[in-house]
Amino acid sequence: MKFVMGLFLLVCQFFGPARLVIAADSKASWQAEWEQTVRAAEQEGQVMVSIGGYGAIIDSGVFQKTYSKIKITHITGAGTDLTQRISAEQRAGKYLVDVYNGGGNSLFQVLYQGKMLDPIKSALILPEVTDATKWWEGKQKYADKEGQYIFVYEGNVSAGAGAAYNTQLLDPREYKSYWDLLNPKLKGKILSTDIRKVRGAGIPWQFLYYYSELGPKYLRRLFGEMDVTLTADLRQAVDWLGTGKFAVGMPIQGGTVYKAKNQGLPVDEFSPYHFKEGVNLSSAFGSLALMNRAPHPNAAKVFINWLLSREGQTLFQKVISQPGDPRNSRRIDVPKDHIPPDEQRRDKMNYFDTDDPDTKDLNPAMKLLDEILAGKK
């Protein structure tokens, strides 16, 4: 017994210091890489970010204050415009943008499919960013099949099809499934934002088209049988809903309905977990990518790691969240007290993740809508 104990202590004495050296080397490795990257970024002097929707993150000045030797410049706008602009610049041989932050659909369809990105995964350096346990479900989310190019840092819970209703015309307790909205008494009383004309309407349409319990069969009945009115004017859609011209709007952006409700209009949304078919998990404008041939590659890495850090994600939630439209980072170590209980993510919930690459292509949905409407003429 004494021999075994002595052998155990001897092994501990021998391997213990080695383990400490390995741990120290590992720590020194990332620290050395980070310090070298920051020094190189300061020599580059600037970083150019194309950012859709979330310009307030940069306007806050926090990054500039933290990294005063790296001037951050940015351009904002609609994702479609920004990605098309980058595409045109690269075709002309101009590589001006370092980092793109914006909606996942335009990022995926234009920049990723156009092969204009470098792997962002290799740009992640800080342990608090690379540590998967800091992220929801213990993993980092990527919106590309390779799991390398489009980092998704936002995960908002939202009602699948983004349906809203007139509270004087409809009792939500009578409708537990999207199929219930095909009730003949609602014929001619449903309006919808037109996916072919409204920017930002893609997420609920992804759900309607790709969700297995709905899909083309449901859309054919909805638009083929229910005399749905299509509109490209979101404000008009909510006004029509509030005045009772229509009983249901699907999809309608939640923030628009929230404002109308607070103004006294008899409108409300179906809560995210209301319908039995499922719940969206969406990133809004919370997708991040590293441009290929970035003019300031080290500064790009510094910005990416900062934004994905606890500080960056806490700031993102703080400056982007609005009443009725909270933003939820996929980081689990940042505050969540601003998010209502019925919009919190739930463990072991089978969400329809709108950032899965197989559901990104909206062209089949638009083609189907054209086909259905053409058949009604």
Where do the protein language model's features map onto the residues?
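A ligand-binding cleft/hinge motif common to bilobed small-molecule-binding domains
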Residues: S106-V110, V248-D268
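Extracytoplasmic ligand-binding site segments that recognize negatively charged/polar headgroups
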Residues: S50-G61, T73-S87, Y95-T243
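Paired acidic/hydrophobic, glycine-rich loop segments that form the ligand-binding mouth/hinge
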Residues: V49, G93-N101, A247-Q253, D268-E269
